[in-house]
Amino acid sequence: MDPNTVSSFQVDCFLWHVRKQVADQELGDAPFLDRLRRDQKSLRGRGSTLGLNIETATRVGKQIVERILKEESDEALKMTMASAPASRYLTDMTIEEMSRDWFMLMPKQKVAGPLCIRMDQAIMDKNIILKANFSVIFDRLETLILLRAFTEAGAIVGEISPLPSLPGHTNEDVKNAIGVLIGGLEWNDNTVRVSKTLQRFAWRSSDENGRPPLTPK
């Protein structure tokens, strides 16, 4: 096993622990809490894949971080922060919309790279809107937190989410997954639109297959 993979997991476990303490003291905003929940699932998946205990990894991660901070000068820290590009967190969905359980009458699931696509094939002749919460950097989607498809009545009929066991995905991964979800929903004569935010940063009116641009809602 690559030692860098192990140390990265250990540090991620400790940093998640620190962020959890922040949340427990009610110092985190909605995007912060959102990422915290998603990252917890991701760490569990990575731990299972690597065969590593999260509690033990957290303790080792703490030692790694403490050693780095001990060697890090304040001036070097300032320079690192100044040179790091800042990402933005964009939200189409509320916390309630993201955390709501949903059920499928005719479930269909497909894995596309590091993303899982789920949809209800029983949905027909509906107007559907795609909404997503994600981070953006350099005017492009950086990390998808969750994408869901909603009917006009607010029912959830589809979803794209990162696989906890396969962390990391690209803008193209997300774009391809959106295409699969839209294609599946349109197969049953549903009309699918995307949010303006998603249209701008992730979908960008794809026309590789001769499709007309989707109209933002």
UniProtKB/Swiss-Prot annotation:
Note on domains (UniProt): The dsRNA-binding region is required for suppression of RNA silencing.
Region (RNA-binding and homodimerization): 1-73
Record-given protein name: Non-structural protein 1
Region named CPSF4-binding: 180-215
Keywords noted in UniProt: Eukaryotic host gene expression shutoff by virus, Host cytoplasm, Host gene expression shutoff by virus, Host mRNA suppression by virus, Host nucleus, Host-virus interaction, Inhibition of host innate immune response by virus, Inhibition of host interferon signaling pathway by virus, Inhibition of host PKR by virus, Inhibition of host pre-mRNA processing by virus, Inhibition of host RIG-I by virus, Inhibition of host RLR pathway by virus, Interferon antiviral system evasion, RNA-binding, Ubl conjugation, Viral immunoevasion
Post-translational note: Upon interferon induction, ISGylated via host HERC5; this results in the impairment of NS1 interaction with RNA targets due to its inability to form homodimers and to interact with host EIF2AK2/PKR.
Record's keyword annotation contains Ubl conjugation: yes
Lineage start: Viruses, Riboviria, Orthornavirae, Negarnaviricota, Polyploviricotina
Subcellular location: Host nucleus; Host cytoplasm
Subunit-structure text: Homodimer. Interacts with host TRIM25 (via coiled coil); this interaction specifically inhibits TRIM25 multimerization and TRIM25-mediated RIGI CARD ubiquitination. Interacts with human EIF2AK2/PKR, CPSF4, IVNS1ABP and PABPN1.
Family annotation (InterPro entries): NS1, NS1A, NS1A_effect_dom-like_sf, uS15_NS1_RNA-bd_sf
